[in-house]
Structure formats: structure tokens, C-alpha cells
């Protein structure tokens, strides 16, 4: 059973009297950021700068948006059409980028260990990398909005978007065990609650996200204070988001970060954290109105795992 921690809604960025950093007598472990599906290295530049401010030397795996088209090679594999696709050799290009980033970060590691930060698919790709190539250099895997779990089989209307890749991860990668030698931390966002496309989709969010506060508010919560036309538009988006959630976890009316459901971003055996008001991607995010996992005020909620 994993350990779960629920953190109160993310506060708006504000000046702090001090920022926790590594002590002058010891350097932090360096961190390697692993981009999510469709993202490129540049999307994480601001996160890299934020981590550097905490004293965490950071390397971002070298990935471009065009690189992701390499995955189309999987279409030639019969396992793709059977839904039993394996990560290798289709994703070997990504594992090579992980390896190159780790080699670049090693000289920055005072004690020979480093942290992996996997965003979205980068999190489960890190798990495959650790299984295939070893993890002697890794002391922390921190995942941000990673869909760790495969969708339920034989669920009506659900198609495995990974074509079996997450089933492979579930069946072949070691179950996380949070230990002093290797820590697993899984961070999930609660940005918007999905809704079923048909049927009763009313969502009462007053008890989840306070509306009359200085906190960023999830999009479903905004329905309480908007005009009817805007509420209908927001409700329709909740249904669309819910259909996305359903393809990942088999349920539409659950909370998530707008792309990955909260329940899919947690792992048994890991330290699981949920953050209210946190959006999935750096693309389309806004540090004030739509903060993502790498926004400064959100990083503050998980940075201590890299500093310890």
C-alpha cells in the first residue's frame, strides 16, 4: 500500500523570506528532467531555472517534438494492433536520450547519485529505463502527472492509447518500494473534475475547492459563480475532459490534472501526493491562473524531496 499525502490548494506565487536550498557544506543531487509525450526540452527551461535557484543542478533530456514521430515505427509491429506493444525497440531513441542526460549529470553528482523527474509519459519511461538499464545512479524517481496504470481491460468504450505499453510496465517493472536508497514520489494534480458525457453529471465542488479564497480555483468550481451560458460551456468541457480520463482509468467523473486522472498518477508502494489546482502541462499553463507541476509555487510543494 502506498503512502498518500493530500496537499491543500496551491497558493498564488508570493515573496518568501527564504527559500530552502542545499547547505553550503553539501551539494544537492543533480536532477534529470524527462519530457512528457509531445513535449520538447525547451518546455522545461523555466523549471530548470527554478530548480537551479534551489541549488539543484539540472539536465533536461534532449527531446524535440519531431522526435515523437519516431514512435510511428510501432505501427509496423503486429503487437501494436493486438494491443501488446513492448517499449523496445520502438522507444529505444528515448532511452538513449535518458542515458545521455544521465551521463551529462553524473559529473555534477557529489555522491554519485541523482534524481529523475519524469513528467507525464516521462515517468513510466523512466521506470522502463531503470528496469532495462539499471538504476545504480538513481536515488529518487519523482513523477509529475504520470499515467502509471494501464486502463482497465474490457471496459466499454475504452481503447488503450498506449497499445499495451502500460500493461508491459505494470507486468515487468518492479513495484515501487519507498526506501532510503531509492525513493519513489508520485505527484498528481487535481485541476478539473471530469463528468460523464450522458446522465447526471452534476458536481458539487464547494467542499473540495473553496470559492471565496485567494487560491486558484479549479475549472469546475468556477461554475458556481458564472452565468448560465458560461456554465454550460464549462460543463461541456468537463464532459470532454471526462472522456479523456475514461480512456486512461475507465472512469469519467474523477478528478485529474486535465489529462491524467489522479488515481492513475499514483502507485502502490510510492509516496503519493495530490495537489489541488495543478494543471498537467507546461504548454498552456499560467503560473498565476493555471499553474502546472513546474510552476514556482507548485515546485515549492515537492522540492524538499530533491533537497533531502
Describe each region flagged by the PLM.
Residues 2-308:
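Lipid deacylating catalytic domains
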Amino acid at each position: 500500500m502506498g503512502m498518500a499525502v493530500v496537499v491543500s490548494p496551491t497558493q498564488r506565487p508570493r515573496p518568501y523570506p527564504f527559500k530552502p536550498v542545499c547547505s553550503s557544506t553539501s551539494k544537492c543531487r543533480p536532477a534529470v528532467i524527462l519530457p512528457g509525450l509531445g513535449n520538447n526540452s525547451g518546455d522545461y527551461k523555466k523549471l530548470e531555472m527554478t530548480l537551479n535557484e534551489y541549488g539543484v543542478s539540472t539536465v533536461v533530456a534532449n527531446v524535440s517534438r519531431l522526435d515523437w514521430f519516431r514512435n510511428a515505427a510501432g505501427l509496423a509491429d503486429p503487437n501494436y494492433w493486438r494491443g501488446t506493444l513492448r517499449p523496445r525497440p520502438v522507444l529505444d531513441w528515448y532511452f538513449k536520450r535518458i542515458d545521455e542526460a544521465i551521463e551529462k549529470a553524473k559529473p555534477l553528482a557529489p555522491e554519485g547519485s541523482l534524481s529523475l523527474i519524469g513528467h507525464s509519459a516521462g515517468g513510466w519511461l523512466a521506470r522502463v529505463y531503470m528496469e532495462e538499464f539499471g538504476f545504480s545512479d538513481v536515488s529518487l524517481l519523482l513523477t509529475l502527472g504520470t499515467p502509471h496504470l494501464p486502463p482497465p481491460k474490457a471496459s466499454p468504450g475504452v481503447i488503450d492509447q498506449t497499445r499495451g505499453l502500460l500493461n508491459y510496465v505494470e507486468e515487468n517493472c518492479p513495484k515501487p518500494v519507498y526506501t532510503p536508497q531509492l525513493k519513489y514520489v508520485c505527484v498528481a494534480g487535481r485541476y478539473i473534475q471530469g463528468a460523464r458525457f450522458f446522465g447526471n453529471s452534476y458536481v458539487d465542488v464547494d467542499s473540495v475547492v473553496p470559492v471565496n479564497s485567494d487560491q486558484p480555483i479549479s475549472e469546475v468550481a468556477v461554475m458556481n459563480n458564472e452565468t448560465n451560458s458560461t456554465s454550460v460551456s464549462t460543463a461541456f468541457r468537463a464532459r470532454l475532459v471526462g472522456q479523456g480520463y475514461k480512456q486512461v482509468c475507465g472512469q469519467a467523473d474523477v478528478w485529474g490534472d486535465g489529462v491524467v486522472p489522479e488515481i492513475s498518477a499514483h502507485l502502490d508502494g510510492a509516496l503519493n501526493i495530490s495537489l489541488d489546482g495543478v494543471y498537467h502541462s507546461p504548454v498552456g499553463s499560467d503560473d498565476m491562473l493555471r499553474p502546472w507541476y513546474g510552476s514556482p509555487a507548485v515546485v515549492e510543494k515537492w522540492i524538499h524531496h530533491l533537497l533531502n
